[in-house]
UniProtKB/Swiss-Prot annotation:
Residues 79-82 are annotated as: Involved in Mg(2+) ion dislocation from EF-Tu. Its main location: cytoplasm. It is found in: Cytoplasm. Associates with the EF-Tu.GDP complex and induces the exchange of GDP to GTP. It remains bound to the aminoacyl-tRNA.EF-Tu.GTP complex up to the GTP hydrolysis stage on the ribosome. Keywords: Cytoplasm, Elongation factor, Protein biosynthesis. NCBIfam families: tsf. It comes from the Bacteria. This is Elongation factor Ts. InterPro entries: EF-Ts_dimer_sf (IPR036402), Transl_elong_EFTs/EF1B (IPR001816), Transl_elong_EFTs/EF1B_dimer (IPR014039), Transl_elong_Ts_CS (IPR018101), UBA-like_sf (IPR009060). It comes from Novosphingobium aromaticivorans (strain ATCC 700278 / DSM 12444 / CCUG 56034 / CIP 105152 / NBRC 16084 / F199).
Amino acid sequence: MAYTAADVKNLRERTGAGMMDCKKALDESGGDFEAAVDALRAKGLAAAAKKSSRTAAEGLVGVAVSGTKGVALEVNSETDFVAKNDQFQDFVRKATEVALNTAAADVEALKAAAYPDGGTVADKLTNNVATIGENQQLRRIKHVAVSNGIVVPYMHNAAATNLGKIGVLVALESEAAADKLEALGKQIAMHIAAAFPLALTADDLDAELIARERKIAAEKAAESGKPAEVQAKMVDGAVAKYAKENALLSQIFVMDNKSTIQQVVDAAGKEAGAKIVLKDYVRFQLGEGIEKEETDFAAEVAAAAGIK
C-alpha cells in the first residue's frame, strides 16, 4: 500500500513523532496509517493517540429535548458557508425536532418521517440541495431517555440555539428537583464536550479498542526487557489506565481536577436529598471520523480555466 507526503504530514500531526520516524513507520506498515500510529506508540515515539478524530466535514449538530427524552442529529454539508445559511439551520433544527417527536431510530427512518412544511424529511433535504446548490446529508442520530428525571442539552460553540459543532446530551435518572438536575447536567455536559469520553463505564468500552491498547502496551513492555511477570503487570496497568481515562464515570472532572464524575454525581445527589444516576450521554462532534478531501485551490482554478 503506497503512501504520500500528505500521509507523513498527517501522521506527524496525529502523533507528534518526527518526520523520519513517521516515514519509517509507514514503510514498515506498508502504508497502513493506523498500523503506523500503533507502531510509533509501541516504540514510545508517539503520545497516546489523540481522542479527537479528524473533523474536517462541515455542517451542524442539532440537539432537542423534551423532559425525559432527548436526541442528537448530525447533518453534513460541503462548506461552512452553507452551515451558516438560515435555510440550512432551519432544516437542521426542524429535522432534529422531528427525530425527537417521532423517535426515529435511524437516519432512514428520519428521512421517511413527515416534515413540518409538508412532504418528508428526505423531500426537504432534496429541495435544500437543489436550492442551496450544495450536497447535504443526514449522517447520524442518537436518542437518550430516562423513566424519571431529566435530559440536559448542551451545545459547545453554538451557531444558534441548540445548533453547533459539538452537541451533548446528559440523561440523569432521579427524583431530585429539576433545577438541581439541570445544573448538574450542564456541568457534566461541559465536561463531556471537553474530555471526549468513549463510553459511560469501563465495561462499556469497545472490546476492539481495549485489545488494541493491550497489544500496544505488550509491545512496549517487551522492549523493557523485564521479566514476564513484570511485563504482564505493566500491560494490565496500562490498560486499566486507558479504561479509567476514557470511561466517563471514572474520568477526573475538568472543573475541579480531582473528583471523578461518579463522585460529582454522588455528591450532587447527597446535596439534593435524592439518589442521582448518570444513565447515559451523547457527544456528537461535527465530522467526527470523517476526513474531508483536501484540494489544491490553484489547481482547481487552472483546471476550470483550461490551463495545464
